Amino acid sequence: MNIRHLGLVALLFSIGCTSVSYTHPEVATIRSYRTIAVLPVEMVFTGKAPAGWTAEQVLDVEEAESLAFQTSFHGRLLERAGRGRLDADVQPVDETNRRLVEVGVGVRESWSLPAEELAEILGVDAVARTRVEKTRYMSDLASFGIEAGTYVLYEIFDDDHDDHVVEFPWLFGLTKTHDISADGALVSGYDGTILWQVEVYRSINWTRSANEVIEGITRKLARKFPYRS
């Protein structure tokens, strides 16, 4: 599913942070979907890959970031649930990914499978799927190799290392300011109905750390998420 083509009309500005959203007109319909799974996030890059990188290396980075965004969005939803602001059950992200692996669905494959099929695999009523599009200048990351980039992405979400998170300007490029957009949707696992949709558009300074960039976007998505008590 390409959630950019679902008829959501948006006027987005090129400065700051803008968002537009759609919620199913029958709120009770949304609330009848009690269990939700957050899917790996579809990543779309419009910049150039660093010189010398293979297509496989680029794909590995995309999938690593997909899981990083998924983990962050899931965490933001759990925060809201812990504060009594989310009236729904969110499946643990580890369980979501384990179930996908067990049936042979990889990160990239999950981006395009129908919501109904994914919901059946995961045993949930609805799935939250997101598409992130951004320009990446990764030339400063090339010398570190794909393993270094992937390690940093996972390291920043390890609670045991929160005190050691530092800025990695080489991860996204030095002194670059570009735009990032995120399209999020909650989709029925029964008939594919769009229950909720939001588009967030921001101007990002890529000298910020990876976790700041990722969590800034997912925090905005979580604030717009339905099921608020």
Whereabouts are the PLM-identified features?
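Hydrophobic alpha-helical segments, principally membrane-spanning helices and signal/leader peptides
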Residues: 1, 25, 108-110, 116, ...
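N-terminal start-of-chain detector that recognizes signal peptides
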Residues: 9-11, 98-102, 153-159
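C-terminal/domain-edge helix-coil "capping" segments
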Residues: 17-48, 121, 134-229
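N-terminal segment of the mature soluble domain
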Residues: 44-137, 189, 193-200
